[in-house]
């Protein structure tokens, strides 16, 4: 067996833990899991170490040869030495929005967390590919890119892979076909103004417009745009199985140099900026992912209606980027 890549996951909450678990089951990479200690009353628990040990024993029970370790860190950046040698770093850590907290408050807190983590990445894993999962993901991806001061190809946000999988799911359910044969992309910001591209969506090469009537397509598009909220309404918390699986798709494309074309939040290059009419921001577009990160930004065709929705999505992201820049400027 060849050299296994090392993936470090910062944040062992629902999404981070499930990313690690899926990677363990695949057995293709070595895993390092980082998190703060968990407080219960007066006692602090090194829960990240327990989760890693539990997953290692799971691998043993299933006969999977893997390596996973847990590391306790603190809010001041201590404990990150094990990042050294990481090929890929996944950031899921972040602060959830609390009652009475404005979106600007949340941006400020999470950008502060991104700064602490970025400092440790620069110190111990400066050549790694960084995948950002923390929400709002387009803004956090932009912040990490600015804080790291690295090549734009190395910082990638997880957004469209998840949104596209939701769109594909709803199409496959509507037509009662395997999702393997459903090809669909969702671009734009990872929020209510995302843009599911019905115009290029197809099943086995057949456009969905010939298989599903226009009214139903609009319903599937709307369900996709609010797909995350639908799960919150059912569970009382955000999704984590599908987001984790989406991150694993990205990790595998990088770690195995698979060169998959996946929708990710990235900083557009000059050529793509002209086509997509979006400069100096991170937003979801199809990209080719390989061992060096973003190898190519793909120009996906849009109908006039989809282009209008795209421009609205870009405007929304741009507005939040301007707010984020004020917070980021405090650290660089």
From Swiss-Prot:
Pfam families, A to Z: Ldh_1_C (PF02866), Ldh_1_N (PF00056)
Matches recorded under SUPFAM superfamilies: LDH C-terminal domain-like (SSF56327), NAD(P)-binding Rossmann-fold domains (SSF51735)
Binding-site residues for NAD(+), renumbered to this chain: 11-16, 35, 110, 133-135
Reactions mediated catalytically: (S)-malate + NAD(+) = oxaloacetate + NADH + H(+)
Keyword annotations from UniProtKB, A to Z: NAD, Oxidoreductase, Tricarboxylic acid cycle
Active-site residues, record numbering mapped to chain: 190 (proton acceptor)
Keyword NAD tagged: yes
Name of the molecule in the record: Malate dehydrogenase
GN (gene name): mdh
């Amino acid at each position: 067996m060849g050299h296994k890549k090392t993936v470090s996951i910062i944040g062992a909450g629902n999404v981070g833990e499930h990313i690690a678990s899926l990677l363990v089951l695949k057995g293709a990479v070595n895993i390092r899991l980082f998190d703060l200690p968990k407080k219960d009353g007066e006692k602090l628990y090194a829960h990240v170490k327990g989760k890693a040990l539990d997953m290692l024993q799971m691998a043993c029970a299933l006969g999977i040869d893997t390596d996973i370790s847990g590391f306790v860190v603190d809010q001041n950046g201590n404990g990150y030495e094990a990042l050294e040698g990481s090929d890929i770093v996944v950031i899921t850590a972040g602060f959830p929005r609390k009652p009475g907290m404005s979106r600007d408050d949340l941006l400020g807190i999470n950008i502060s967390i991104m700064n602490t983590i970025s400092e440790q990445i620069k110190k111990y894993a400066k050549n790694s590919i960084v995948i950002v999962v923390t929400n709002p993901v387009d803004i956090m991806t932009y912040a990490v890119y600015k804080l790291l001061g690295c090549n734009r190809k190395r910082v990638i946000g997880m957004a469209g892979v998840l949104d596209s999988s939701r769109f594909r799911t709803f199409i496959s359910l509507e037509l009662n076909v395997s999702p393997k044969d459903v090809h669909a992309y969702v671009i734009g910001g990872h929020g209510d103004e995302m843009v599911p591209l019905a115009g290029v969506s197809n099943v086995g090469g057949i456009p969905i417009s010939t298989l599903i009537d226009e009214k139903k397509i609009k319903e599937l598009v709307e369900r996709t745009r609010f797909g995350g909220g639908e799960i919150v309404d059912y569970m009382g918390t955000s999704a984590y199985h599908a987001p984790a699986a989406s991150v694993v798709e990205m990790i595998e494309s990088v770690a195995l140099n698979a060169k998959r074309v996946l929708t990710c939040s990235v900083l557009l290059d000059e050529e793509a900026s002209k086509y997509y009419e979006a400069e100096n921001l991170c937003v979801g577009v199809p990209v080719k992912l390989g061992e060096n990160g973003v190898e190519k930004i793909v120009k996906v065709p849009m109908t006039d209606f989809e282009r209008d929705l795209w421009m609205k999505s870009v405007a929304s992201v741009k507005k939040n980027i301007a707010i984020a820049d004020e917070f980021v400027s405090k650290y660089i």
